[in-house]
């Protein structure tokens, strides 16, 4: 292990796991660590909407086909604003030309299914190691690079004066609750 670069990833949610899978393509050792156990990381009551841009990324790492059995696609999306009473309906005909033949606008996946697929994938790599912070500390590994995937306002980054690189976009993102109505196919 001494002749390879050592990467440490703090935070083993979807971002940390996907980062470890991406870095695993290089000749390096990747040490994933989190305060939560694997079971606790998987067992969260969350759901994600997957867009076509995310689908493309997952496909590059051969994860899309592994996730497909757990995805629920939707071909129309109704967006309404309860304050202004405005609404709009989107369908597959509203997709960009490069993905206009797609049957779905997007997909929904449970957090636990996504995490199970990601953890199963990292188990296939001999250069990715998932450890508790205490066990990792006892190994006394000198890390060449450290990544924190513990959230935007993580205390981890603030405590160790970590360089936090952010990119501002001229777009905004809204978080909202979704009500799923109608026929849902797998």
Label the model's feature ranges.
Residues 2-8:
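Extreme N-terminal starter segment of soluble prokaryotic enzymes
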Residues 8-10, 21-46:
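Glycine-rich FAD pyrophosphate-binding loop
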Residues 10, 148-149, 176:
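Redox-cofactor binding/interface segments in oxidoreductases and associated redox assembly factors
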Residues 12-14:
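Glycine-rich Rossmann-fold phosphate-binding loop(s) that bind the pyrophosphate
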Residues 18:
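Short alpha-helical segment within the catalytic ATP-binding CA
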Residues 43-84:
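N-terminal FAD cofactor-binding segment of flavoenzymes
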Residues 70-160, 167-172:
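Conserved N-terminal helical subregion
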Residues 172-186:
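Flavin-dependent oxidoreductases
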């Amino acid at each position: 292990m001494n002749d390879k670069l050592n990467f440490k990833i703090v935070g083993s949610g979807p971002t940390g796991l996907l980062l470890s899978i991406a870095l695993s393509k290089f000749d390096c050792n990747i040490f994933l660590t989190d305060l939560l156990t694997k079971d606790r990381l998987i067992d969260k009551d969350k759901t994600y909407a997957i867009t076509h841009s995310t689908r493309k990324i997952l496909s590059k790492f051969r994860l899309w086909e592994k996730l497909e059995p757990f995805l629920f696609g939707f071909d129309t999306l109704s967006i309404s604003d309860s304050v202004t009473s405005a609404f709009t309906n989107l369908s597959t005909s509203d997709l960009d030309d490069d993905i206009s033949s797609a049957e779905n606008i997007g997909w929904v996946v449970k957090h636990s299914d996504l995490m199970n697929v990601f953890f199963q994938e990292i188990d296939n790599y001999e250069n990715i190691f998932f450890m508790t912070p205490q066990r990792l500390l006892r190994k006394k590994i000198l890390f060449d690079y450290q990544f924190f995937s513990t959230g935007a306002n993580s205390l981890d980054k603030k405590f160790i004066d970590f360089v936090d690189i952010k990119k501002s976009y001229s777009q905004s993102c809204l978080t909202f609750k979704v009500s799923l109505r109608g026929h849902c196919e797998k």
